[in-house]
Structures are given as C-alpha cells and as structure tokens.
Amino acid sequence: MTHIRKSHPLLKILNKSFIDLPTPSNISTWWNFGSLLGACLITQILTGLFLAMHYTPDTMTAFSSMSHICRDVNYGWIIRQLHSNGASIFFLCLYTHIGRNIYYGSYLYSETWNTGIMLLLITMATAFMGYVLPWGQMSFWGATVITNLFSAIPYIGTDLVEWIWGGFSVDKATLNRFFALHFILPFTMIALAGVHLTFLHETGSNNPLGLTSDSDKIPFHPYYTIKDFLGLLILILFLLLLALLSPDMLGDPDNYMPADPLNTPLHIKPEWYFLFAYAILRSVPNKLGGVLALLLSILILGIMPLLHTSKHRSMMLRPLSQVLFWTLATDLLMLTWIGSQPVEYPYIIIGQMASILYFSIILAFLPIAGMIENYLIK
C-alpha cells in the first residue's frame, strides 16, 4: 500500500519538497541558510502580527504606542526585541546565503538566482518601511532622506516623491501607507519564496564541488532535516542572546527620541544592514549618480551569470577567485563601517575607493581571474 504522504494531493507536494527530495550527499553547513531564512521569515511574520495588534500608525500616537507595547502589553518588550533584532539576523543569513551562492557558483541556476534577487529587493523595502514605523528621530529623518532620492529621477522625480509621501512632507499619510505595505509585503515574500523553491527543485541543489551529483544523492529527510534543525537551534539561541542581553546593540540611540521635523540628527544613517549601500550612495558627489550607484550595487548581482568565465563552477578549486571573493567580503565590511561614519575626510575618500573596488571585482577582476584560471589548467 502506498504511504499517504506519497498519495495525498497536498502531502505529495510537501513530500517531494522536504522528505524524499534527492539531495547531494556532500553539501556543507553553508547550505543551511535557506531553511534559516524561511524560519526568520515565519518568526518576523508572527512577532509582527502581535505587534500590529497594539501599534497605531498615526504620527501623534505611533511613538507612544511602541512605548505602550514595551511597558504595558504582556511580554510586549520581548516581542518587539525579537522582531527588531530578528531583522538583523534575517539580513545576516541573507547576505551569507548570497555569499555562498557566489562562492560555489549557484548563480548559474539563473531562474532561482533572479527570484532570489527579487526576494532581496522586497526584503530591503520591507525592512526600510519597518524602520520608519516606531516614529523616532532616525525613523523620520531616514524616511525623509531615502524617499527624497526619488526626486533625482528626471521630469517625474518631484511628483513621484510627493505621491509616495501622500503630501508635501513625510507625515501621517506616509506612516499609514508604510505600515500597510510593511504588513502585506512579507506575505508576498512567502509566495515568491515558493517560486524560488520550485525553480531550485527543478534543477536540484548545487554542491561544494560544483559538479553534477545525480549519481550520489540521498533523501532530504532525515539527513538534512536534522542538520537544518541544529542550525535552527543555534539561530534561536543567537537571537535570544541578542534580544535578551543586548537588545539595543544594533539600533540607533536617536530612535528613542520622538520624531521632530524641526531638529535634524547630527548624522542620519540607516540600520547596519543597509550601510554598505548607503556608503556607495554617498561616495558619488552627484545625486542622480549616487542613486544609480545605489541601485546598481544590488542589481549588479543579476548579471553575475553572464560574467562567469571559468570552466569550473565552484571557487573551491580556484585560488585566484577565492582571494578576490574574500577581498569583496572585506570590502563590503569596510563599506558598512564607512556608512556609519560622518561625511568628512578621510571617510569620503575611503568610501569612494571601496565603492570602486566593489564594482571592479564583480565586473572585471572575477571574470579576468576566471580566464586566467582556464589558461592555467590547460
């Protein structure tokens, strides 16, 4: 008799995706981050749902409603800290996941890669709108500065910014629509993650060697479900340590002051996970040029499959490409640091050099390294 998980219409889909899925036998811990991202998304949706029950998207009461959640709502403080620090863990997993895909050449699965880039963009938009909701100083000024970037678009820029704001400045209408979008976008992310997984299961997972593994596959359950569960436990431990012992470590002290349109903070900056892109934006003196550089810093990932020149898929056996990859990772850390610093010498010149290096590695150095490695293995 056929097991119900193989015959039931719904369970059959889950079985093919998470139980009997043929998986390469040699995938490492770096392959855990996909499932961790799914766990992060579910955690964010659940904690966000409980926060939304007590939050009021109104400029007069938004800040005090956050205070009310932390002081008066049962376990409201831990729900808020899990949600805000959960976003940081989410982006940490996200960037690690992207880094692993670049290192092991998984971007050659172009459909999976492109849906992943779409997920990244939606996640960034969702996180930005979420940062505005507490209506603190950095929330208000961050929203003002970032939405103002749209005014750099020729002809329609000013009208577009006022359309986004719902008025002539960031105000009640802006907060209201940001709350609505922040609430709905994670559900579109779930749908897109389903598409992402569907494309991945069409091709099967890549592996550290970058070779075809059709002759050496094992079922996903129990081998990788146990492995993913261990990763999940470590993630939960890390999140709880962060939320309980140092909840404000990654936040900005300015956000504990209510939004004041008449008082500009000394140094406006976004959350740490956007600092690399913010540093690239600031490194270009021209406004439109900066906005284009900001966009390209993310969209450049989309052309990576076209820039792959090596005969080897993975970087595991390509020492020259490995050096460039870790240089890129270090460069991103440097950009993150620069984004948190004031706009003055020597930070300006360091930011410009780091931005040039970022684009140079992806557009020129990695493809050239691939060609050199091809020549060396002849």
From Swiss-Prot:
InterPro entries documented for this protein: Cyt_b/b6_C, Cyt_b/b6_C_sf, Cyt_b/b6_N, Cytb/b6-like_sf, Cytochrome_b, Cytochrome_b_C_euk/bac, Cytochrome_b_N_euk/bac, Di-haem_cyt_TM
Entry's Gene Ontology molecular function annotations: metal ion binding; ubiquinol-cytochrome-c reductase activity
GO biological-process terms attached to the record: mitochondrial electron transport, ubiquinol to cytochrome c
Free-text comment on the cofactor: Binds 2 heme b groups non-covalently.
Gene3D superfamilies the record matches: Cytochrome Bc1 Complex, Chain C
Binding, a ubiquinone: 201
Positions contributing to heme b b566 binding: 97, 196
GO cellular component, one term: mitochondrial inner membrane
Compartments (UniProt record): Mitochondrion inner membrane
Keyword terms of this UniProt record: Electron transport, Extinct organism protein, Heme, Iron, Membrane, Metal-binding, Mitochondrion, Mitochondrion inner membrane, Respiratory chain, Transmembrane, Transmembrane helix, Transport, Ubiquinone
Family assignment from sequence similarity: Belongs to the cytochrome b family.
Subunit structure as annotated in this protein's UniProt entry: The cytochrome bc1 complex contains 11 subunits: 3 respiratory subunits (MT-CYB, CYC1 and UQCRFS1), 2 core proteins (UQCRC1 and UQCRC2) and 6 low-molecular weight proteins (UQCRH/QCR6, UQCRB/QCR7, UQCRQ/QCR8, UQCR10/QCR9, UQCR11/QCR10 and a cleavage product of UQCRFS1). This cytochrome bc1 complex then forms a dimer.
Remaining remarks: Heme 1 (or BL or b562) is low-potential and absorbs at about 562 nm, and heme 2 (or BH or b566) is high-potential and absorbs at about 566 nm.
Protein name: Cytochrome b
